[in-house]
Amino acid sequence: MANAVVAIAGSSGLIGSALTAALRAADHTVLRIVRRAPANSEELHWNPESGEFDPHALTDVDAVVNLCGVNIAQRRWSGAFKQSLRDSRITPTEVLSAAVADAGVATLINASAVGYYGNTKDRVVDENDSAGTGFLAQLCVDWETATRPAQQSGARVVLARTGVVLSPAGGMLRRMRPLFSVGLGARLGSGRQYMSWISLEDEVRALQFAIAQPNLSGPVNLTGPAPVTNAEFTTAFGRAVNRPTPLMLPSVAVRAAFGEFADEGLLIGQRAIPSALERAGFQFHHNTIGEALGYATTRPG
């Protein structure tokens, strides 16, 4: 898609800021959808909580990318925080989906997560598999359902089910690196739970690919091609920072430290593979966890 106009909600986050820079470097026009007063003509104002967003602002837009959502690991879970996880995803998606439908925008790329699949244990899953159980799985189901107005309008909707994004600039890796760098990295519980990961570079490339591919729609796993267990990740991360990783944090300690999130996001996992991306011809720059961690630990944060 040459010289496209792309509107992005959530453009200030880890993925959104990297995607904005990559699209502009490729000579696309990026309109940032912001809550504050717009600073220039490349910003569009909205208030998703009140439903305030003028669909006419999207008249000349080729694609909308929605990356809104509070980080699930931002703090210890409570009833109020779990509600904020839902509200920060579902409400903005409803508002944007309706605006896409009203404005006749051709493409909506909407964030989701591999948490959709629940706890897959050793089972390999792809986009053809159904939703799992648990809070995060139901959150993803409701999040994706909120795109229905755009789908019914005839827009091409991509549900970008992202795994753990590996980047030196933020996210899980940046929080964990200080521990691993002094030899305190540890596997969590049994270490047998799977983790679907993707480097930030490939995440951004996959989103650009999804914007440009007219035949790609529906659920698309944005994960590297080789998911690993927590034990394998721990060993690979230690190797990347040249430190041993002999430690294990017992499940009871993980639960004491992280509460409910331990059993939703740390002691269980997804063994998801990117079948839809690979069928469409996408090629990863980082095919293994070693390559992804090498990329993420040798670049400045």
UniProtKB/Swiss-Prot annotation:
Extent of the signal sequence: none
Gene Ontology biological process: cholesterol catabolic process
GO molecular function: cholest-4-en-3-one 26-monooxygenase activity; cholesterol 26-hydroxylase activity; heme binding
Example of a GO cellular component annotation carried by this entry: peptidoglycan-based cell wall
Highest taxon in the source lineage: Bacteria
Pfam families linked: DUF1731 (PF08338), Epimerase (PF01370)
InterPro entries to which the protein is assigned, alphabetical: DUF1731 (IPR013549), Epimerase_deHydtase (IPR001509), NAD(P)-bd_dom_sf (IPR036291), SDR39U1 (IPR010099)
Annotated family: Belongs to the NAD(P)-dependent epimerase/dehydratase family. SDR39U1 subfamily.
The protein's name: Epimerase family protein Rv2216
Source organism of the structure: Mycobacterium tuberculosis (strain ATCC 25618 / H37Rv)
Taxon lineage: Bacteria, Bacillati, Actinomycetota, Actinomycetes, Mycobacteriales
